[in-house]
Amino acid sequence: MADVTPSRTGQVSRKTNETAVSVALDVEGTGSSKIVTGVGFFDHMLDQLSRHSLIDMDIKAEGDLHVDDHHTVEDTGIAIGQALAKALGDRRGITRYASIDLAMDETMTRAAVDVSGRPFLVWNVAFTAPKIGTFDTELVREFFQALAQHAGITLHVQNIYGANNHHIAETCFKSVARVLRTATEIDPRQAGRVPSTKGTLA
């Protein structure tokens, strides 16, 4: 039988006076990634996002890292969100909703998503240190704010407990990856319909 899986890919190039970011992703991927942002910890987190969502990601970012990591992280979130929105199109046939409680050693983080076309972030995550290595922990929220806004998704992230800041950050990325994987999957019972009584997710 022929493969009838729809092509769901998105590409975005974004250039400002502060950054140049290119993103190509495939929602129907296997979680392979090629990521270079110049921010080592951020690259590690994006690899987790790709691997556990099964969304293939090719990301290249060049930013004003001599200032700090903020613009690079935020603009990468914007570009990933825009590419995801392009890949999902009118969101016809998707599962739409997903949630998970994700454990990593001593840490537990909850994520829930509605791939609704309505951007919103509820963030209930507190770090106990301002940095993980050289990476500002406040940038984790900035990334997900940019992603949610430009992907057009409602995203809730709550760290239930945890002691290690690396683990807290990593469970945020992994839990969001897992809910994106589920919510963006095609539900055959939807029969190609938009999963909304309004008939549109926009």
Swiss-Prot record:
Record flagged with keyword Transit peptide: no
GO BP: L-histidine biosynthetic process
Covalent S-S links between cysteines: none
Entry's Gene Ontology molecular function annotations: imidazoleglycerol-phosphate dehydratase activity
Keywords, sorted A to Z: Amino-acid biosynthesis, Cytoplasm, Histidine biosynthesis, Lyase
Coiled coil feature spans: none
Xref: Pfam families: IGPD
Organism domain of life: Bacteria
Pathway: Amino-acid biosynthesis; L-histidine biosynthesis; L-histidine from 5-phospho-alpha-D-ribose 1-diphosphate: step 6/9
This protein's name: Imidazoleglycerol-phosphate dehydratase
